[in-house]
Design a protein with these regions (language model features):
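Ser/Thr-rich, low-complexity intrinsically disordered terminal regions
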Residues: 1-147
């Protein structure tokens, strides 16, 4: 993949039971201590540095999910690795150096939210890149016409 792509992390996925990767029910892999990750399933109080709000879903959850997936796929240098009716794992590659960030979305239709996790593979700091990526996606999703 390239010198700056790093290794795909273990434990990715939206874990729906406590046995899966040691995570709590309905959660992504926790962020490490590094400030280069955001996660909507992080504890808002205990892990405020990594916490980011999930995307609210109004209307039909399946349509909102399809819109979110289409928005991710429309971003340049994105490779979708895994896609299902409720989970998406994509790799974002930076333009200049080819750094790879791992981005996950998970639809929780009953809670009317789409959970999100975005993390850099390499380095310690991301200068807010993962948080900015999620907020851009949030803005595009909010601006998308209801289907």
């Amino acid at each position: 993949m390239g010198l700056f792509s790093g290794k795909r992390p273990d434990g990715l996925g939206f874990h729906t039971d406590s046995k899966a990767g040691g995570n709590m029910a309905g959660a992504f892999k926790p962020c490490s201590w590094k400030p280069n990750c955001v996660n909507s399933t992080a504890d808002q109080t205990a892990d405020a540095a990594h916490y980011i709000r999930p995307f609210n879903v109004s209307g039909d959850a399946a349509k909102a999910w399809a819109t979110a997936v289409a928005l991710v796929k429309a971003v340049p240098r994105v490779s979708v690795v895994t896609e299902s009716a409720t989970y998406l794992y994509a790799q974002y590659r930076s333009k200049l150096m080819g750094y790879v960030d791992d981005v996950e979305l998970a639809l929780d239709a009953s809670a009317k939210v789409i959970h999100v996790r975005s993390a850099s593979r390499l380095g310690v700091r991301d200068f807010g890149a993962n948080r900015a990526r999620v907020e851009r996606l949030r803005a595009k999703l909010a601006a998308a016409p209801a289907s």
